[in-house]
């Protein structure tokens, strides 16, 4: 992946689309089937998450790209890219997710369970999100965006 140049609307749109879609689906699954939230609580959480994800999508993309660059300095391998995706996802998303759950009235136990589960599931989810984000950036034809091999 190339380093990012000046602001690009396609880049921001791709990052926003990826964040909103991915987080809506995965968040609802975790909240209902793992954390024991009701459908109504989860729907409220996911509805609140849409504007939040719109606001954080591009900054997350910038943060992720930075973490990937740092990881490539250590090793250019595919496993390092996956590890970097995981680290970026957990570090950035966990505090945001906890705040959303708190705002919609989830109990402390539900918040801890959901955030901890999300962090554990992120071992695969952060990597999957990275692949999904890369795919969205290609779909949106982000200028100068390439995926490095390895």
UniProtKB/Swiss-Prot annotation:
It comes from the Bacteria. Its main location: membrane. GO terms for biological process: amino acid export across plasma membrane. One of its GO terms (molecular function) is L-amino acid efflux transmembrane transporter activity. GO terms for cellular component: plasma membrane. It is a multi-pass membrane protein. It is found in: Cell inner membrane. The chain crosses the membrane at residues 17-37, 48-68, 86-106, 111-131. Pfam families: AlaE. Keywords: Amino-acid transport, Cell inner membrane, Cell membrane, Membrane, Transmembrane, Transmembrane helix, Transport. Exports L-alanine. HAMAP family: L_Ala_exporter. Belongs to the AlaE exporter family. This is L-alanine exporter AlaE. It comes from Vibrio cholerae serotype O1 (strain ATCC 39315 / El Tor Inaba N16961). The gene is alaE.
